[in-house]
Amino acid sequence: MSFSNAPISFPGLFGDWQFTVPSKALNIGSGIYWYGIIIAAGMLLGLYFCMKQAHKYGLSEDNVIDTVLWAIPLSVIGARIYYVLFYLDLFRNSDGSINWSSTYRIWDGGLAIYGGVIAGFLTAYLFSRRRKISFWALTDCCVQGLFIGQAIGRWGNFMNREAFGAATELPWRMRLWTSTTTYMDVHPTFLYESLWNVIGLLLLYFIVSRARRFDGENTCFYFIWYGLGRFWIEGLRTDSLYLFHWTLFGQRIRVSQALSLVMVLVCAGILVYQFKVKKADGSNLFVKRVQQTTEAEEAAAEPTAPDEKQ
């Protein structure tokens, strides 16, 4: 059932007041959608924030800009491919063949964040190798912008009336009207995830990043924090992507929950290894190595005073 342009209300918070926000911002050509505008705004704000943080990680603003300018389009492509692969039945014609023309209509919604993250991190890895900079320092800087982009981008789902949760009677439930007399009360999961990302950003910026002891620590925190939140929120949603037709204990396996669990376990293992085995203390951070190299080059470039005549 499509809820595009359906009236919205929050009866537990605002009573009978309802409002309608069109999914299209401008009717130019096939239309300019709020979904795309909001996602683009999130990306740009995330990029700006990362640029201003770059020096703290031994990076230049150009490093961040060049990485993100490549990562953004490739991440969108990755997010769409991921969504299409796991929701392939939605893109089939009545005879079972794939309707290829519908696979690229991203303005109608249908981007899977994990596909975008995978593509973005692969781009960052290739870029870091080419520029000879630390991949983990680069991702430590960029995950801050990723939190920002996701927190803002989830409001694109709100504009499309998608990615909501199961029926609920909680006070903050969101009501989607299908007619003047029929409606659905659901979990506003887009809001849950947006707030979860905002909290993650605050914890990362004010606590984790200021006590960073190894390159990759911010990245591990991002995957653990986002993974825990996504595992919980995904269980509330009704439009989950499933791992083909595989089941566990009689239940179909949700792709995002499976990936979230793997991410949390792997990154928790990395933290234990770094702190307990390698005894990471921050002395080998990329930013410190860059500072030491710069100081050595400046010292070598200083003119040597001529010997005094005897």
Where are each of the predicted segments found?
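A feature for loop-to-transmembrane-helix boundaries and adjacent hydrophobic helices
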Residues: 1-310
